[in-house]
Amino acid sequence: MPELFGHTRARVAARHALITPENHVNSTVPGITGATAAVLINPAMGAGFAQTLVTFQVGGRARFADAALETFGYVLSGELEITLAGRRQHGREGAYFFAPPGHVAELANPSAGTQVMLFQKTYVPLAGVAAPEPVLGDVARVAGQPFLGDPAANLQVLLPEGPAFDFAVNVFAYQPGGHLPFVEVHVMEHGLVMLDGEGVYRLEDDWYPVRRGDVIWMAPYCAQWFVAMGKRPARYLYCKDVNRPVL
């Protein structure tokens, strides 16, 4: 249903944000050609990372090569070729890659309209621990586990959990009526995109109906809670910072 004139579900607050597909405005981003790039979260709003939606035309390309930045990409729709660390993967919906600092990731030969969601941040080294290795994967090959024993909430962990990795990316799936078991308040910052379904997200003292394509930023210690609603399961992809000293 179209939005009412002058109305939006989007909101940018001091410690959280909801950005909906109806609000996207494209930017020009170095390294991305033959595609549009909507920068949905970045430090301009107070975040410690960037989250960008790339929509490719036929012949579009993207190249990520930075000595300090790490890049995670997830194919939301369509298909393309992913090249990373000498390996090439034909990626369809659910394929993903992780390029640590100093590694080159290239995306090429997309079908028209292919969409990739990117999470990018400056890598934080850990003394005595080598940098992480590149990752190519597919969510369909990742086993899920009931979250805290609840079969209505299933968690898939997409990256290794060792100390080399300073952030995690997971997929959370809920059956209709499934929900987080309590309101979370924690140090980890989140970027999130709804993959399927719909529900209600509590962010601090506000409650937001959310659906496929919506993007959420949650600052550290932002109170948060989710319940899946409607007739079908809900899923979201999210990142968080992990494995680093508290000070």
What is each model feature region?
Residues 72, 86-101, 204-220:
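Short acidic-glycine-tyrosine-enriched beta hairpin
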Residues 1-48, 111-167:
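A short, N-terminal "cap"/entry segment at the start of jelly-roll beta-barrel domains
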Residues 58, 68-85, 187-205:
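Glycine- and acidic-residue-biased ligand/ion/polar-headgroup-sensing regions
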Residues 157-247:
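Structured core of small recognition/catalytic domains
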Residues 45, 88, 101-126, 211-212, ...:
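Ligand-binding loop in jelly-roll beta-barrel domains
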Residues 20-21, 33-39, 50-67, 155-160, ...:
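Conserved short histidine dyad/triad with adjacent acidic residue
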